[in-house]
């Protein structure tokens, strides 16, 4: 039984820095997919939605009307 114990001890030694349990791999995968899809859909919403006023949008701006009333 002694040689088997020696083989187990050598197999347990790893040269890597982090020891991540195998059970956490699906969790990391799910979080990665959620982050990627959240980033994609947020970017898509901000890029294509014309009702958001992120940039100067003169069609939806009532600033000119307010300034014109102020001058009168």
From Swiss-Prot:
What Gene Ontology terms for biological process does this UniProt record contain? negative regulation of protein-containing complex assembly
Q: Which UniProt keywords apply?
A: Cytoplasm, Membrane, Transmembrane, Transmembrane helix
Cellular-component GO terms for this entry? cytosol; membrane
Q: From the Swiss-Prot or TrEMBL record, state where the protein is found.
A: Cytoplasm; Membrane
Q: Can the keyword tRNA processing be found in this entry's annotation?
A: no
Annotated membrane-spanning segments are 20-42
Report membrane topology.
Single-pass membrane protein
Major localization class: cytoplasm
Record's Pfam families? B12D
InterPro entries attached to this UniProt entry: B12D
Can you tell me which family this protein belongs to? Belongs to the UPF0495 family.
Q: What is this protein called?
A: UPF0495 protein YPR010C-A
Q: What species was this sequence derived from?
A: Saccharomyces cerevisiae (strain ATCC 204508 / S288c) (Baker's yeast)
């Amino acid at each position: 039984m002694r040689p088997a114990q020696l083989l187990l001890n050598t197999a347990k030694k790893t040269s890597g820095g982090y020891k991540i349990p195998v059970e956490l791999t699906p969790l990391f995968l799910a979080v990665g997919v959620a982050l990627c899809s959240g980033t994609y859909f947020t970017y898509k919403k901000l890029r294509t939605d014309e009702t958001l006023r992120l940039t100067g949008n003169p069609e939806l701006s009532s600033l000119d009307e307010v300034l014109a009333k102020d001058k009168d």
